[in-house]
Swiss-Prot record:
Tissues where this protein is expressed: Testis-specific. Expressed in the spermatids and spermatozoa (at protein level). Specifically present in the principal piece of sperm tail (at protein level).
Region Disordered, annotated ranges: 1-112
UniProt lineage: Eukaryota, Metazoa, Chordata, Craniata, Vertebrata
Name of the protein in question: Sodium/hydrogen exchanger 9B1
Keywords, ordered alphabetically: Antiport, Cell membrane, Cell projection, Cilium, Fertilization, Flagellum, Ion transport, Membrane, Sodium, Sodium transport, Transmembrane, Transmembrane helix, Transport
Transmembrane segments annotated in the record for this chain: 122-142, 146-166, 167-187, 206-223, 238-258, 266-286, 311-331, 341-361, 371-391, 419-439, 449-469, 482-502, 523-543
């Protein structure tokens, strides 16, 4: 229907209504007024509106809908931009095709994608290195401290990436930290490379303490009070029991096998007592996504307890570290360690209350400000406590501060966790690379390795057995208890921090105790190398076979799901 016909129809309607009204009033006036519109009625052919009148009555309201496409016709004319855009896209596609034709068979010149990104990053790195060389000088040249740090970082990073690319069918992926550890070990035991890699003790100590701080911050932010209340006794038994029993058994076995003093034995025990969330959490999340063990909450239990287990181990290590390197009596050492714990808790509460209200919620870039404030305050607390001799206080300050802040922020802490996780991604290659550089093949004797393996194996056996027994009081089947016990053996990050920390403290404060510290370092290295890949394989293989599979109707909300340390 054309616009002219529509207008004529409207006029017809108006004319008929006027006719009916005027007839009711005055028929004479009707005859007079009808004379004028008659020529207008004859213009649009009278035969067309008559059959269309019933159509007009029903879809009168639909006519404006039919007019919409008619109204869009001028809009199509106006936005010729779309036509120009389509023409531009066509021309760009034609240009791309022409460029591809010009390239011919040599389609990789200039390169695209990953190769292009790698070349770009390399050029930026060279430019940055040139700038640092102009500012610092010899530090960035081979043999300098910064040069060695960069070599270790990139070697460990590449080692982790290479291990990620190695995929074996039917076998779960291996943790990248093993590749980082082996990269540092390779640098240490290749004389040509290690000749140019020198890192001062103060640098490595500061880096390890910073990595430890990030671990504790992530642990504090990741603690979920609701999950802990829901799991209650089971989570507490799994967090405290195996760690304490493994520490005591390691102290006992190292005392009789390796001739360790009792203080050093307990220090070694708390180094070994921590489980690695870097191995446990990703594998638990994979099982959870497929519905394995979700009905009984096994993934939730292991994820929540892994963080608490690390906290117990680090606190025990700091306590015995202060006991080992102090010259007082046993009673005075115990009192000083309790003093450190009390100071750490009180300072952490005060700083945690401050962080809850500062910065306020009306500030810009609130997430970045909060993350920076928490990290800077925690790192300052750890390094400052180390400097003044309160070895057991810094970690507790960090833990209490981050936990109180997370409790106040609730769901807003997710963005802060992501920032802290990105910070950890930078320090992780440095940490494991530095651990690898501390282990020299020349200094290792077969007898020493045998004693370390014996102590490690016996302590792990006690841990597995104690975990199984402690889970007997929960509502788990026999196979599920076996799975939980075997899932509780991987060790990685905490051992990478605490093992070298004891060695560096011995070098600075008591060089005559360096032999014990090297033995602790060796046991920590072997624990990472043996338990991390084997633990990942056991979890990935036994999980689908042992745990019951159920339909996942909703995602499991666990705050520690981003915990990758």
């Amino acid at each position: 229907m054309s616009e002219h016909d529509v207008e004529s129809n409207k006029k017809d309607d108006g004319f008929q209504s006027s006719v009916t009204v005027e007839m009711s009033k005055d028929p004479d006036s009707f005859h007079e007024e009808t004379v004028e519109p008659k020529p207008e009625l004859k213009e649009p052919e009278p035969k067309e509106p008559e059959p269309k009148e019933p159509e007009r009555k029903e879809p009168e309201r639909k006519e404006p809908e039919r007019k919409e496409p008619e109204r869009k016709e001028p809009e199509r004319k106006v936005p010729g931009r779309r036509e120009t855009q389509t023409k531009e896209t066509q021309t760009t596609e034609i240009e791309r095709k022409e460029t591809k034709k010009k390239r011919g068979t040599n389609s990789y010149c200039p390169p695209q994608g990953t190769i292009n990104k790698t070349i770009t990053d390399g050029a930026a790195l060279i430019a940055l290195w040139t700038l640092l060389w102009a500012l610092i000088g010899q530090e960035v040249l081979p043999g300098g401290n910064l040069f060695g740090l960069v070599v270790i970082f990139y070697s460990a990073f590449l080692g982790g990436k290479i291990l990620e690319f190695i995929k074996i069918p039917v076998v779960p992926p291996l943790p990248p930290l093993i590749g980082m550890l082996l990269a540092g070990f390779t640098i240490r035991n290749v004389p040509i490379i290690y000749e140019f890699v020198h890192i001062p003790t103060t640098w490595s100590s500061a880096l390890r303490n910073t990595a430890l701080t990030i671990i504790l911050v992530r642990a504090g932010l990741g603690l979920d009070p609701q999950a802990l209340k829901h799991l209650k006794g089971v989570c507490l038994r799994l967090s405290f029991g195996p760690c304490f029993l493994e520490a005591c058994s390691a102290a006992l076995f190292s005392h009789f096998i390796m001739n360790f003093p009792w203080q050093w034995g307990f220090l070694l025990g708390f180094v070994l007592g921590a489980v690695s969330p870097a191995v446990v959490v990703p594998n638990m999340l994979m099982l959870q996504e497929n519905g394995y063990g979700v009905e009984k909450g096994i993934p939730t239990l292991l994820v929540a307890a892994s963080s608490m287990d690390d906290i117990v181990a680090i606190t025990g290590f700091n306590t015995f570290l202060s006991i080992v390197f102090s010259s007082g009596s046993v009673i005075s050492n115990i009192l000083s360690s309790l003093r450190d714990v009390l100071i750490g808790v009180l300072v952490g509460i005060v700083m945690g209350v401050f962080v809850q209200y500062f910065p306020s919620g009306d500030q810009e870039r609130l997430t970045q400000r909060r993350a920076f404030l928490v990290l800077s305050m925690c790192i300052s607390a750890v390094l400052g406590c180390q400097h003044i001799g309160l070895h057991g206080s810094g970690g507790l300050v960090t833990l209490v501060l981050s936990f109180m802040a997370a409790k106040r922020w609730a769901e807003e802490k997710v963005g802060i966790q992501k920032i802290v996780a990105n910070t950890w991604n930078v320090f992780q290659p440095l940490l494991f690379g530095l651990v690898g550089t501390e282990v020299s093949v020349e200094s290792l004797e077969s007898k020493t390795i045998g004693m370390c393996l014996a102590t490690l194996g016996l302590a792990l056996s006690v841990r597995i057995l104690s975990t199984f027994v402690l889970m007997s009081f929960a509502n788990f089947r026999f196979k599920e208890k076996v799975f939980i016990a075997l899932s509780w053996i991987p060790k990685a990050t905490v051992q990478a921090v605490l093992g070298p920390l004891a060695l560096e403290t011995a070098r600075v404060m008591a060089p005559h105790l360096e032999g014990y510290a090297k033995a602790v370092m060796t046991v920590a290295f072997l624990a990472i190398l043996i338990t991390a890949p084997n633990g990942a394989l056991l979890i990935g293989i036994l999980g689908p076979k042992i745990l019951e599979q159920s339909e996942v109707t909703f995602p499991l909300k666990v705050e520690l799901s981003n915990f990758h340390h």
